[in-house]
Amino acid sequence: GLLETGAEVVAIEIDEVLANQLPDTVAERMPGAVERLEVVLSDALDVKVIPGAEPTALVANLPYNVAVPVLLHMLAICPQWSTGVVMVQSEVADRLVAAPGSKIYGVPSAKLAWYAEAIRVGNVPPTVFWPVPNVDSGLVRITRRRPPHVDGRDPRVTRSQVFRVVDAAFASRRKMLRSALAGLCGGSMAASELITAAGIDPTARGEALDIGDLARVVEALAQAGALSDSGQV
């Protein structure tokens, strides 16, 4: 387990019974490790600050119904953690690691790519759980990286701006980018001009663009004043 490595562990658990039991279980099986464990009783999406020393890694069995929002939230509030392994439903694992051009590449793939590289590193059969679920699970390894470069430099855009454009680009997979972003740009003609200025084909679809391409589009829109931002990073 994590405590056996000598690491300090912060465990986030929404179930009060499990959260209360965990310290007792550790005290019974690894008495010397109790002081290195802190349990936070909370919905992970409500956590704003991780107590104690800044965490450097994430290891999680994510709730399958909210796996993507929880993962993105943890990446946002813990900019210092550099690596992680998460278990999610098999189909979600495929979407998280999907590459541009694939049928399952979408919002989760692009948003995760803003933060990190992700690869699928294993399968977990339902038979290892009790009770046995009717879904397969997958393990995804995440390695944080800097946001993608735009023309060899860091993009002059914020995460919130990028995510707004990602949401718009994938809202309708059949739409060309100029149509998908028309609402942000004041029309498809303006969108086409700005997308072209970014060096991207305005007739392309969002599913064909990697996060670097999308960041270039966002920068062009932001420079033209097409995106207002609250200052989030």
For the regions a language model picked out, list residue spans one by one.
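Catalytic cores of RNA-modifying enzymes
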Residues: 1-165, 196, 207, 216-219, ...
